[in-house]
Design a protein with these regions (language model features):
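Short, exposed "boundary/linker" segments that immediately precede the start
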Residues: 1-6
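A nucleotide- and high-energy phosphate-metabolite-utilizing enzyme signature
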Residues: 7-184
Length: 184
């Protein structure tokens, strides 16, 4: 029986997208491992491919999390009044940032947003920009780390963000710039 996507509950579609990402990662990780074992890929290329795979997955995870958060709260605004689309960056540090990812590597990530801290989102359940981007960051971490039947995508380490584990999950672009200039 065929049922159009619009009839599926949102959570069912969301879970199927999470599973699809995990299958994508597993399939491509297997291809890289097989190429490595057979001698067709040198170690430097293995880390390149694994890093590119992580970047592709991060791009899709950001898109999924963005759609989910915007659907719930609306779109945040920048200081000039334009809508953020998304106005959010995932910065990779450590092995992912150095293009040195291995098969079991975690992702050292930092989240930065360009939203106006004084503005609210434009949706039915508006929240301030800082809260919106925090929820977006939490959703991204959940998508990456949640255990499903196919496992998890990656372990995530957020301790390299400004002020470490005691800092905000998502920094504004201005705060990140000040931190890099004065404290890093």
């Amino acid at each position: 029986i065929y049922t159009p996507r619009t009839l599926f509950p949102y959570t069912t579609l969301f879970r199927s997208q999470m599973e699809a990402l995990r299958h994508f990662k597993l399939a491509h990780s297997l291809r890289v491992a097989a190429s490595e074992i057979s001698g067709h890929l040198p170690l430097m290329k293995v880390s390149d491919y694994l890093t590119w795979l992580a970047e592709a997955i991060l791009e899709q995870v950001l898109a999924l999390a963005w759609r989910h958060t915007v659907a719930k709260h609306g779109t945040p605004k920048r200081s000039d009044g334009t809508l953020c689309d998304p106005g959010f960056v995932i910065v990779g540090y450590g092995k992912v940032g150095g293009i040195e990812l291995g098969h079991g590597s975690d992702l050292d990530l930092v989240f930065i947003h360009d939203g106006d801290p004084q503005a609210e989102t434009d949706g039915a359940k508006p929240i301030d920009s800082a809260q919106f981007f925090t929820r977006l960051g939490q959703r991204i971490i959940h998508l990456l780390t949640a255990q499903t039947n196919s496992g998890q995508l990656y372990e995530v380490d957020m301790r390299l963000r400004p002020s470490g584990a005691s800092g905000l999950l998502v920094s504004s672009l201005g705060a990140f710039d000040r931190y890099q200039r004065n404290e890093a």
